[in-house]
């Protein structure tokens, strides 16, 4: 997973509250067996409306989503995070996230930054009055900058550390690779062992 320290990109104002995971990615797209290629599924129902924000330039090139409260509610589906990332989003700002969505985001390298609703309102105004304005998201200082708005955001220390280090679940496990190898070396031969990684032919 790529480490996240700072990101600067076009902000996308999504004046919607209670955006659930079925709105982020409809269930029909969950039949796919891959982890990539979900950009077409992001907000699929809403994107049928030509006036939807992601159908308008320059917002269609945005990488920082600024949403209303209670973003990512509903069923737990990692596909919601995959769709946001595949479209090109690096961070989502909201005053409140569903716990499961926030957890899935941190594990997949998408920053879910909790920003006070008053600051979200100010950022929305900047983005709507000046389309194409970029937002700088700084995970080191835990701040966002948009025009003349500078606001702090909240994120738990553990998720922040994982994002800064670029550690997904596999990366965390591989930090203990030497210990795992040493343990398996002492196990009886008839017990299961970790298979070596497959090397693809060039």
UniProtKB/Swiss-Prot annotation:
Keyword Aminoacyl-tRNA synthetase: no
Catalytic activity annotation: (2R,3S)-3-isopropylmalate = (2S)-2-isopropylmalate
Keywords for this protein: Amino-acid biosynthesis, Branched-chain amino acid biosynthesis, Leucine biosynthesis, Lyase
InterPro entries named in the record: 3-IsopropMal_deHydase_ssu, Aconitase/3IPM_dehydase_swvl, AconitaseA/IPMdHydase_ssu_swvl, IPMI_Swivel, LeuD
Gene Ontology molecular-function annotations: 3-isopropylmalate dehydratase activity
Pathway where this protein functions: Amino-acid biosynthesis; L-leucine biosynthesis; L-leucine from 3-methyl-2-oxobutanoate: step 2/4
GO biological process per UniProt: L-leucine biosynthetic process
Enzyme nomenclature, EC number: 4.2.1.33
Assembly notes: Heterodimer of LeuC and LeuD.
Protein name, per record: 3-isopropylmalate dehydratase small subunit
């Amino acid at each position: 997973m790529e480490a996240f320290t700072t990101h600067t990109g076009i902000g996308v104002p999504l004046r919607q509250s209670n955006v659930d995971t079925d709105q982020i990615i409809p269930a029909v797209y969950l039949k796919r067996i891959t982890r990539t290629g979900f950009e077409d599924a992001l907000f699929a129902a809403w994107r049928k409306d030509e006036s939807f924000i992601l159908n308008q330039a320059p917002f269609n090139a945005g990488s920082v989503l600024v949403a209303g409260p209670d973003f990512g509610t509903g069923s737990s589906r990692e596909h919601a995070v995959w769709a946001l990332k595949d479209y090109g989003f690096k961070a989502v700002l909201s005053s409140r996230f569903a716990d499961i969505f926030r957890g899935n985001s941190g594990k997949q390298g998408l920053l879910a930054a909790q920003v006070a609703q008053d600051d979200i309102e100010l950022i929305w105004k900047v983005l709507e009055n000046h389309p194409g304005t970029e937002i700088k998201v700084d995970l080191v200082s835990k701040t966002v900058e948009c025009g003349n708005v500078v606001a702090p955001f909240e994120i738990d220390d553990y998720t922040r550390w994982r994002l800064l280090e670029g550690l997904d679940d596999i990366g965390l496990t591989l930090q203990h690779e030497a210990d795992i190898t040493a343990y398996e070396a002492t196990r009886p031969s008839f017990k299961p062992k970790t298979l070596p990684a497959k090397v693809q032919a060039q």
